[in-house]
From Swiss-Prot:
Keywords: Antimicrobial, Disulfide bond, Fungicide, Plant defense, Secreted, Signal. This is Defensin-like protein 183. GO terms for cellular component: extracellular region. It is found in: Secreted. The keyword Disulfide bond applies. The gene is LCR19. GO terms for biological process: defense response to fungus; killing of cells of another organism. It comes from the Eukaryota. Belongs to the DEFL family. Its main location: secreted. Disulfide bonds join C29-C68, C36-C55, C39-C62, C43-C64, C80-C126, C91-C111, C96-C120, C100-C122. Residues 1-26 form the signal peptide. It comes from Arabidopsis thaliana (Mouse-ear cress).
Amino acid sequence: MEKALSLVVFIIFSIMLASVENKVNANTCIEGIGNCQQCDVRCKARHGPAAKGACDSKFQLCTCNYPCGQGPSPPQPKKCYGGAGICSDRCGAQCCNQNCAQKYNQGSGFCDSIGNTSLCKCQYNC
């Protein structure tokens, strides 16, 4: 009777352990992130401290295992550059910035000297 009870407890414990393991594995996502150089460090930088990078020695590829839902942040918008004329005593850095803000969506401007000429350069989201 005591052996049967021990066996039942062991079976229940094994089922519980397998169930927990499946739940953990079900929430793990995988991403290939290139070569093996600093695999674990790059994986953690991309997906947080719970992520684990593993290198496939045969193919020299890094695979990142991380908890699903904790992926990389959305990509930042691409930056484009344009011009808004010449910077001068009459239109300096503040004027340049205002011109770029009016000319481009979410634009900002700065004066950049090239030789004897100071150009108003704009940076904005493409």
